[in-house]
């Protein structure tokens, strides 16, 4: 029988669980927890925190954003990872595309050894050098290169036992605005997106285990924010593209998702086709979401179980690994040059 997970992902404030955190995690509707820099003091502390979380609830997906470059929540005692743009440029210049595989493996291995199940990675937005929020987080400005480089990175993650999440569907690379602060608007047509931003989603639909939806409005395609849109999620992502994996909302506390109560944000996201919704940095919003789920008998999800790591690894084993030491030396040479 497939394990069931609650469909809400929340955050915690500190470096250890509070009694309030434990009470929330124990709720059957909470099936995920996302970590931030504030939750990290040291590697051993983080290992203990992840173990504490799993002792409260076995069926909980522990996540983080450990992309590399400027979006890397864990730095001290973890390998400093280059941005995906830097990584793609080096791989292209040297024709050493296995480097992408290596870094995907290393990132995933360090997290799994710590007790973290997934990094929300890779970013498969196509960089058009207009986005304040994407930029160097993207592998390339060429869609086919994004697909090629991301596939190598995903293979590395999978080799370590971690499932990959592509983001931010349908594409954030052409947007100037930051959806954390406002609802970005993209006036391109679906045909234009099919020829550009959506190419990696078609190419990687079978390689990705999950996709995270963006809070962006495409008024020429649908009047609803893509993250809330059945047209985008059901008709385009699932039917037209053929994606069959897990679908995450982006953070519902972002300004790009505002204009509704948290109850409505959760309801609309789930109705649109999201398997799991994220509410970060707003405990009142998370509690409101739980009450909505309780009052409406929202079912748990069996599909989330597919995101759990397929391998186990300890830091002792990882630090003794010739593979890790080899990759770290390569990355050190990149930093020096």
Regions from the PLM with identified roles:
Residues 1-62, 70-78, 337:
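N-terminal hydrophobic targeting/anchoring segments and the immediately downstream early-domain regions
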Residues 10, 38-53, 72, 151-158, ...:
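Second-shell residues forming the walls of enzyme active-site clefts
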Residues 12-27, 99-110, 195-201, 261-268:
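Short, acidic/polar
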Residues 41-48, 91-109, 141-149, 191-195:
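Glycine-rich anion/phosphate-binding loops
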Residues 54-82, 100-126, 154-170:
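Glycine-rich, aromatic-flanked loop segments that form ligand/cofactor-binding clefts
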Residues 78-94, 140:
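A charged helix-plus-loop insertion that forms the helical arch/lid used to bind
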Residues 118-141, 164, 169-186:
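Short glycine/serine-rich loop/turn segments
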Residues 298-301, 308-337:
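A short C-terminal boundary segment appended to hydrolase-like catalytic domains
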């Amino acid at each position: 029988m497939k394990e069931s997970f609650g469909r809400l992902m929340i955050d915690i404030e500190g470096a250890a669980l509070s009694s309030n955190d434990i009470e929330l995690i124990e709720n059957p509707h909470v099936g995920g927890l996302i970590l931030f820099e504030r939750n990290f003091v040291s590697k051993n502390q983080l290992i203990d925190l992840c173990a504490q979380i799993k002792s409260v609830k076995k069926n909980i997906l522990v996540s983080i954003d450990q992309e590399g470059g400027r979006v890397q929540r864990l730095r001290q005692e973890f390998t400093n990872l280059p941005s995906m743009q830097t990584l793609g440029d080096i791989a292209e210049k040297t024709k050493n595309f296995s480097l992408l595989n290596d870094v995907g493996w290393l990132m995933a291995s360090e997290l799994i050894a710590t007790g973290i199940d997934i990094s929300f990675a890779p970013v498969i937005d196509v960089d058009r050098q207009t986005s304040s929020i994407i930029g160097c987080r993207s592998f390339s400005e060429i869609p086919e290169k994004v697909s090629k480089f991301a596939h190598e990175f995903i293979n590395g993650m999978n080799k370590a036992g971690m499932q990959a999440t592509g983001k931010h569907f349908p594409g954030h690379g052409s947007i100037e605005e930051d959806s954390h602060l406002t609802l970005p608007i993209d006036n391109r047509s679906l045909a234009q997106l099919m020829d550009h931003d959506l190419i990696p989603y078609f190419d990687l639909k079978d390689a990705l285990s999950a996709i995270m939806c963006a809070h962006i409005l495409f008024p020429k395609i649908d009047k609803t924010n893509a993250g809330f849109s059945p047209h985008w999620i059901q008709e385009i992502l699932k039917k037209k593209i053929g994606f069959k994996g897990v679908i995450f909302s982006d953070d519902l506390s972002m300004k790009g998702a505002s204009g509704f109560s948290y109850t409505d944000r959760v309801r609309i996201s789930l109705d649109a086709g999201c398997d799991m919704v994220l509410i970060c940095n707003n405990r009142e919003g998370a509690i409101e979401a739980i009450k909505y789920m309780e009052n409406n008998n929202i079912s748990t999800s069996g599909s989330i179980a597919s995101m759990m790591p397929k391998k186990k690894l300890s830091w002792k084993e990882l630090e003794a690994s010739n593979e890790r030491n080899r990759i770290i030396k390569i990355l050190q040479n990149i930093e020096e040059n």
